[in-house]
């Protein structure tokens, strides 16, 4: 059997992690009855006796190159290699092919309630209104759909009206080596941490607004740590200028290694105001470290933090709710409790076991 895996968008971040994890599972499966053909852009994966890797780096040059690849090159590859089944890790199916397709959907923008205007964010508007239509049509066309979370499954069913049995939830593999858990101390209960990129939907501004309000009502000492340099884009530059001008207790410490982020979960409180995520990985990571978490009240956070005693929620569009939570912690009106053992057991599964069962 010939199975072709498409993932030309993956070059970094979570998408690349999903690709690498899946490739490793395939490489370790040792099933000689399946020939795997990985179709990628720039990532380099090792070929084996039953794994072939096709790279098309020019796909990343522009949207036009990507559209040309999807509409003409991809279908030709399926026919050229006499593919029996396609596994698409890139949110959309391959057009103009007759073989069965399994679709992995991890782009949440077409399914969230928040709607971007073209003026607010051109790229996200395109994802929601143009690419989003393609993703929704692909969910309808694929024989099987895999998503990372229950909320995504529910949203897919609501938007596409497909049979819910067609969509399966398989959380991504999260390789965590937990070396320590959150410890309460004066330092940890007055340090807040937000590991996130500088995208606007990550909602750093809400934290600034909350800090500005706390400055008016409290003299308690605390600090907030961002994993930003302060010059990533115009949005982040504006955040940095606000912090400097108003002397808010926010530190721009720049990117941190995975190990450094894990260490921060043990000695600070995670603030997560993002309102557009599929999973919200820091939430899961903090929970694994038995951390103290303040999270936006959204479907993804409710799912990842379900039944977790040390998770508190706020409206991601109401800074006063976050202000109240931070102020309550600083005044010791909101306390950390020792979580039950085994809180996160069973959250993660391996993708490959389900995929192989679908493709035989």
Task: Please annotate each region the language model reported.
Residues 237-259:
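Nucleotide-activated donor-binding/catalytic signature segment of Leloir-type glycosyltransferases, i.e.
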Residues 140-158, 162-179:
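Donor nucleotide-sugar binding/catalytic pocket of nucleotide-sugar-dependent glycosyltransferases
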Residues 311-320, 327-333:
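Conserved acidic donor-binding segment of nucleotide-sugar-dependent glycosyltransferases
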Residues 76, 124-145:
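Membrane-proximal helix-turn-helix segments that form the acceptor-binding/catalytic region
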Residues 42-43, 223-237, 254:
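Glycosyltransferase donor-sugar binding loop
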Residues 4, 185-202, 208-211, 225:
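Conserved donor-binding/catalytic core segment of Leloir-type glycosyltransferases
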Residues 13-24, 199-215:
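A conserved mid-protein helix/loop that constitutes part of the nucleotide-sugar donor-binding site
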Residues 275:
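Aromatic "clamp/platform" in nucleotide-sugar-dependent glycosyltransferases that forms part
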